[in-house]
Each structure stands twice: as structure tokens, then as C-alpha cells.
A protein has these predicted regions:
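A domain-level signal for the structural core that forms small-molecule/cofactor-binding pockets
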Residues: 1-126
Length: 126
């Protein structure tokens, strides 16, 4: 961790993949520091046209939805609320810097806190 999954309409994502990966990584480094750079994992999921729905209707211009997997301890220690606010702001700024300001207002960032001992890598609890 941190692991970020960005779901973005394919029409917005196409051609912007490297820049978005870089910007999201830099957003995490901005908040945590340089030590976190090699730990940042970004998955980009391009959603094809007709496969994103809002209010029961398909849309092709939805704003990105970011899921940010983070250790629970990062949010429960002193200053955790400030860390959460900084992460949400930095990730939103990163999206807007690559996909344009029109994406900012609707971009959602969900911080998913994982308790210690509740995730693993390579078959081992991490």
C-alpha cells in the first residue's frame, strides 16, 4: 500500500495513461514523502462507453472515481484526519491536472482503510 484504482471513462483516459499514473504517484509522494514512491501502485480501469451509469442512465462524461487502499493506522493515528484531507485534495488535483479542470468537481476519492493483518502479498499476510 498505497494502492490506487482509478476508474475513468475510456474516452477521457485514452492517451493520458502515463501522465495520470505519474500524477497520482506524485500526489501520494507529496503527502507521504519520497520514501513512499516505490510503494505506490496505480491501476487504471478504462470504462468503455455505455458502461457507466448515473441516475439509471448511461453517461460517457462521468468524472473519475478513485479508490485508495491505505493502512488503517495512517488514518487513526494523531493527524489522521489531516492526512486523509491532504490525500483527497492531492489526488483530486492530480486528476484535474491530467484530465482537465472539468473533472475536478465530480472526481470521487474513497479512502479504504485496511486493518493490520487483513491484507497480503504473495500468499502472506502483510
Amino acid at each position: 500500500m498505497p494502492h490506487l484504482t482509478a476508474r475513468v471513462p475510456e474516452a477521457q483516459l485514452a492517451g493520458n495513461e502515463p501522465a495520470l499514473i505519474t500524477a497520482l504517484t506524485e500526489a501520494v509522494v507529496e503527502v507521504y514523502g519520497e520514501w513512499a514512491r516505490d510503494l505506490v501502485v496505480v491501476h487504471l480501469d478504462g470504462v468503455p462507453g455505455g458502461r457507466w451509469g448515473i441516475g439509471g442512465k448511461t453517461v460517457d462524461d462521468a468524472a473519475p472515481a478513485i479508490t485508495f487502499g491505505i493502512r488503517e493506522a495512517a488514518l487513526t493515528r494523531p493527524g489522521g484526519n489531516e492526512t486523509a484531507a491532504r490525500l483527497v485534495a492531492a489526488v483530486t488535483d492530480a486528476v484535474a491536472s491530467v484530465l482537465g479542470e472539468q473533472a475536478r468537481g465530480g472526481t470521487s476519492v474513497e479512502l479504504v482503510a485496511t486493518p493490520e493483518g487483513r491484507s497480503g502479498v504473495g500468499g502472506v499476510i502483510a
